[in-house]
């Protein structure tokens, strides 16, 4: 018997589900990413000084770059803000624009606002074709992962979210 596999989403059948507790959320990632990515969860992440400005949930890294230099390889981070913390940090930010350096409001639920945070500088190894190829693959495949994150956790999609290299709103798909 298939455990919760969507008929309309065969390619996602081979997934690893990661979860965090504060807030309780899950992220389904393709099993194939095991070879090319490192995913850190809240429990693995040393909360930076920014923790007061939101809770880091998940971080995706390209494996070749990250194993060479832990300051490299970041593809994106998912961050949850309470509504108050969000307002304190960003004020009355326009959710249809990129906020901060490169942050995108993916959606919200009754308690939190969820941001996709992209690095502002090059994160793959520029002299390494494998790193570049894998980095681009992770960016492309993140669309399904991030859309799934919103759907699986019943997060209301920010329909005005600007397009990023990792995520675009699929208009009308989750009405």
Model segments located where?
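Short, acidic/polar N-cap/turn motifs at the starts of alpha helices
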Residues: 13-17, 24, 103
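Short, solvent-exposed coil/turn segments at beta-strand boundaries
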Residues: 31-32, 108-113, 119
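N-terminal, intrinsically disordered, polar/charged segments of Gram-positive cell-envelope systems
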Residues: 1-18, 161-175
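Short, surface-exposed beta-strand/loop micro-motifs that present aromatic residues
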Residues: 97-108
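Short, surface-exposed beta-strand/loop "edge" segments at domain boundaries and coil↔beta transitions
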Residues: 26, 64-74, 114-115, 121-131
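Extracellular/lumen-exposed scaffold segments
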Residues: 89-90
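Secretory pathway targeting signatures of secreted, lumenal, and periplasmic proteins
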Residues: 22-85
């Amino acid at each position: 018997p298939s455990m919760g596999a969507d008929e309309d989403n065969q390619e996602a059948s081979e997934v690893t589900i990661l979860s965090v507790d504060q807030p309780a959320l899950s992220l389904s990632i393709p099993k194939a990413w095991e070879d090319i990515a490192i995913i850190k969860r809240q429990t693995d992440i040393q909360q930076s000084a920014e923790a007061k400005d939101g809770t880091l949930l998940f971080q995706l890294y390209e494996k070749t770059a990250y194993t060479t230099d832990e300051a490299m390889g970041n593809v994106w981070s998912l961050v949850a803000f309470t509504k108050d913390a969000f307002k304190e940090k960003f004020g009355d930010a326009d959710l249809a624009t990129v906020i901060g350096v490169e942050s995108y409001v993916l959606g919200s639920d009754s308690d939190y606002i969820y941001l996709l945070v992209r690095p502002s500088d090059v994160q793959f190894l520029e002299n390494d074709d494998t790193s570049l190829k894998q980095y681009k693959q992770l960016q492309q495949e993140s669309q399904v992962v991030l859309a799934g994150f919103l759907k699986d956790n019943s997060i209301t999609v920010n329909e005005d979210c600007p397009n990023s290299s990792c995520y675009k709103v699929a208009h009308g798909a989750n009405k």
